[in-house]
């Protein structure tokens, strides 16, 4: 494939592939800087503490009826029109980053703060105005979910997190989607 390209050029092309892929995959949000501002993120529901996943907030396979936690988000920068929440299981490599357990989005109006309501897991019908599925969970087989997959380790002590991102989500053709600020919150273990 690169037979007519010098070894140095080939090495540059190959080393740039992950960067190029990052700009066009995973939602396609271009970071506005190398060091993004931090959002303030906390739980809006006292049942969520960041220690243990609350009772019943796991997947149906293990008897739960999990929903995303409601979150309070502050320090949302000007220019943001949506918040994207990427859910991950840090203990299970294939679903440990980039929204392995799904990406849920919320349209917002302006800078400042927002409360993101809880939405149900394991369904494409979120039932909350202004929310949307940015990407379904990457789980497969009996673990497959059309949206958010709640913690589903069967209680093995896996660690779950949410990466919360303030973005400008392009609304017109030719616009660029931008990542403006972000923050991780530990959901807990299950």
Where are these regions (language model features)?
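Bacterial N-terminal signal peptides that target proteins for export
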Residues: 1-12
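C-terminal motif of bacterial Sec signal peptides marking the signal peptidase cleavage site
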Residues: 20-22
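N-terminus-centered regions that define maturation/targeting leaders and the start
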Residues: 24-190
